[in-house]
């Protein structure tokens, strides 16, 4: 997967990484479901946080020269907890492409194909980004 996207664009690489079953399992996005407050179930925020912190904009705003942007000496964050919660809702409903065993919690299936979307597990409500 990395070999295929090593010299391509960032968007395609991020999509391939996001849909890869090993990444989905490692950062707990695989089998992530839409919220159900009655069952005290909420989307897992782990992958959303890593996308923001490690794979894209980082923790703090930067000047063009890479130095931290400050406000009265304080670092300025690039995103909020609300941003993470909304992005976590985007990353719901993904699982192994072959779920022929029918179990949402099982990790048996095809680990060589990109994960597939499952609409009944996805948060289909409106989402906002960055405030």
Q: What is each of the regions a protein language model found here?
A:
Residues 1-131:
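Active-site substrate-binding loop specific to GH73 endo-beta-N-acetylglucosaminidase modules
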């Amino acid at each position: 997967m990395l070999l295929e996207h090593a010299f391509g664009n960032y968007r395609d690489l991020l999509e391939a990484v996001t849909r890869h079953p090993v990444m989905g399992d490692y950062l707990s996005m695989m089998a992530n479901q839409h919220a159900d407050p009655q069952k005290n179930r909420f989307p897992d925020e782990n992958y959303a946080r890593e996308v923001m912190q490690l794979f894209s904009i980082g923790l703090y705003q930067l000047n063009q020269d890479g130095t931290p942007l400050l406000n009265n000496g304080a670092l300025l964050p690039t995103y909020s907890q609300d941003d993470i919660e909304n992005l976590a809702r985007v990353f719901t409903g993904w699982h192994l492409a072959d779920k022929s065993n029918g179990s949402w919690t099982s990790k048996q299936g095809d680990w060589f194909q990109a994960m597939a979307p499952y609409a009944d597990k996805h948060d289909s409500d409106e989402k906002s980004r960055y405030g």
